[in-house]
Amino acid sequence: MMSSRLVGTALCRQLSHVPVPQYLPALRPTADTASSLLHGCSAAAPAQRAGLWPPSWFSPPRHASTLSAPAQDGGKEKAAGTAGKVPPGEDGGAEKEAVVSYWAVPPSKVSKEDGSEWRWTCFRPWETYQADLSIDLHKHHVPTTILDKLALRTVKALRWPTDIFFQRRYACRAMMLETVAAVPGMVGGVLLHLKSLRRFEHSGGWIRALLEEAENERMHLMTFMEVAQPRWYERALVLAVQGVFFNAYFLGYLLSPKFAHRVVGYLEEEAIHSYTEFLKDIDSGAIQDCPAPAIALDYWRLPQGSTLRDVVTVVRADEAHHRDVNHFASDVHYQDLELKTTPAPLGYH
């Protein structure tokens, strides 16, 4: 302890005899320098040119915006994150730079085959298709096992309150149906995705197939939203039903994927029946056959002049495809196989 004190005392004595550099007095704050520091005046400019104030080790790096750079450089540089020009607005304003993003990622411009602008951002032209109307609408999987019978009775039990609530308001009924039908594909796709990551294995294309099914059902909902505007209590019902059904199906898929897919297969059979009744009411005049929404014309590549009846027809064909896919997936599990061993029907809406 004493030796440390002696060494410290000797070091202090040596430092006390070190001559002070001549430029240090220039660092003492005066009235002028204090004023320049407080008000941003140019009084410190001579000291800066002389290299005396501030020293390089004291001055922090400058983190200023680059937006003012064009004014200083005569407008030679453009601000980062801008691309393209915006045409003058309706108020006669001048052209403005279109701010894309901080990362300067420009949005892609998509056009139709005829060169007109593509109006939708929720889907692209290469995601559109023509529905296969030749599919058999009368297929029915006859339940043979206890799980099959339980799945069928579960779907029948879900249909009973729907019939009471909506009766023959099939536009609103279809809207409610699609909010439920879009859940299983997403749940199954997510669980298979996590399984693929967890086991370091491929899925056989089933992740994409189920997510495509969920997206297709969501597009059904977006279409019928243009036809039937839901009331506030119907929106509240959607929240309740979706919250319960999502968690129930999630748990059911974890416990038994073959049961979960069988439930969806029977649910799609009921959807086919509902859309068939929808078409009967359109043909009888009970429901007005209004023009098809624009989103339906582009998504299903329907010809101009198509009506609501054409939309319901292609949606019913989609449901028939979903019926076949889910019954097929359930059959794969019943044979004690995994979905990854059987190629998925990609693009099979």
From Swiss-Prot:
Cofactor(s) annotated in UniProt: Fe cation
Membrane topology: Multi-pass membrane protein
Record key words, sorted: Disulfide bond, Electron transport, Iron, Membrane, Metal-binding, Mitochondrion, Mitochondrion inner membrane, Oxidoreductase, Respiratory chain, Transit peptide, Transmembrane, Transmembrane helix, Transport
CDD domains: AOX (cd01053)
Region described as Disordered: 63-93
Catalytic activity: 2 a ubiquinol + O2 = 2 a ubiquinone + 2 H2O
Cellular component, GO, one term: mitochondrial inner membrane
Protein name: Ubiquinol oxidase 1, mitochondrial
Organismal lineage: Eukaryota, Viridiplantae, Streptophyta, Embryophyta, Tracheophyta
Gene behind the chain: AOX1
